[in-house]
Design a protein with these regions (language model features):
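Amphipathic alpha-helical polymerization modules
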Residues: 1-148
């Protein structure tokens, strides 16, 4: 593994975690939005398997465009819909009520997404730390090469 591939792997991780954070932030922002369905980011190791192969092993969900990255490392392969149904409440005067007077609430659990966002943030920080270490290693190698 070269130093440049270490940078590429960490950059792929930064990109994947950034995209994950956007999904979690969107979920949290829509916690109170009726009919909103929680999105689940799918982050995979960068392999030769297609997203379709990976998702076939998981729950059926909504496939959206995702992030790809040429280096080894993590890739956000896509986003799938959480199949958990939202709670229905009877509110016939609500403008979004169905013909029977029910409104389906969002299926987002804000605590779950906050915990996932914190985990994502820590993974992002870890990738930044790796970049810092690799940068220091490269600088030390240059110093050794200069004879000092």
């Amino acid at each position: 593994m070269t130093l440049s591939s270490s940078f590429e792997i960490s950059a792929a991780g930064l990109t994947a975690q950034s995209e994950r954070m956007k999904v979690h932030a969107n979920n949290i922002a829509n916690t109170s939005t009726p009919y909103y369905v929680r999105k689940i980011p799918v982050v995979v190791e960068n392999t030769q398997a297609s997203f379709e192969d990976i998702i076939a092993e998981m729950h059926q969900g909504v496939l959206k465009a995702g992030v790809t990255y040429g280096a080894s490392g993590a890739t956000m392969a896509g986003v799938m819909a959480d199949p958990t149904p939202g709670k229905k409440i009877y509110e016939p005067g609500h403008p979004q009520a169905d013909k029977h007077g029910y409104v389906t609430l969002s299926n987002v659990n804000p605590m779950t997404d906050m915990a996932d966002a914190m985990s994502t943030s820590r993974l992002y920080e870890a990738n930044l730390a790796v970049i810092g270490v690799v940068k220091n290693m490269a600088n030390k190698a240059l110093e050794i090469g200069r004879g000092g």
